[in-house]
Amino acid sequence: MRHPGSPILEVLGLAYGYNGETLQHDVSFDVKRGSIFAIMGASGSGKSTLLKVLIGLQRPSAGEIAFGGVSYCSLDDPERAEIGRHFGVLFQGGALWSSMTAAENVALPLQMFTELDRPSIEALVQLKLTLVGLDTGRDRMPSDLSGGMRQRVGLARALALDPEILFLDEPSTGLDPISARHFDDLVKGLRDGFGVTVIMVSHELPSLFGICDDGVFLDAEARTAIAHGAPHILRDECTHPTVQAFMHRGSIAGPSQSRGCS
């Protein structure tokens, strides 16, 4: 039986980088089922690269990642792809195919990874678009959509196969404050309503403080994780200067109580 709050993803001693250069090493954390988990850190700390490692687009140089208790870093490509079927991913900007309509973008994973007939796929596409608040615009091209609408289409596509974990890479980038807040509310509603676990790369303080209930903080200089916990707890209780500088960018952070890092 799967219990809410039990670990759905476990990361132990992870190291990764590019072209022989290590971005991060000895990174460990657990993601609880049903949580909204933040990957935090300044620019260049390896947040988006960590996401690529977690979803299997890049292999780590050391360490283990386990989904539901199954370690998948050392699996061959077909076996890792099977694990990946449990993941939905929204890359920066939505990453939509420019030559496809909104509906065609959402339909693509259903066409690729299921044997559903066309009417069933059409029904699911409409369901997913409605789920993210897009009752209209299914036949429009990405270039004709606003930034917020493109993100919603990308989110609908990420949800197409009913993932257990939803990965979001800087989902608020390029959105105005109102659109960003609406998107945050949508993500929280998906977690609350459907129990999906969310792992989100973000540097946006309103999103971090507003919807994330756990997280890990990566430091570019130390090249490892220097703090763990909910963003608002790190803001109020972590004394590490790098964490404090990140969390207190602007008045939204509020006063720190500085009681140490978890």
Model-predicted regions and their roles:
Residues M40-A42:
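The feature captures the beta-strand-to-loop junction immediately N-terminal to the Walker
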Residues I55:
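Helix-to-loop junction immediately C-terminal to a conserved catalytic motif
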Residues G63-S71:
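Conserved ABC transporter NBD signature motif
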Residues S71, P119-T136:
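Conserved ABC ATPase "signature" region
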Residues M141-L145, M149:
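Conserved ABC ATPase signature
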Residues A160-E164:
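A short, proline-enriched helix->beta-strand linker immediately N-terminal to the Walker B motif
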Residues L166-D169:
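Catalytic Walker B motif of ABC-type/P-loop ATPase nucleotide-binding domains
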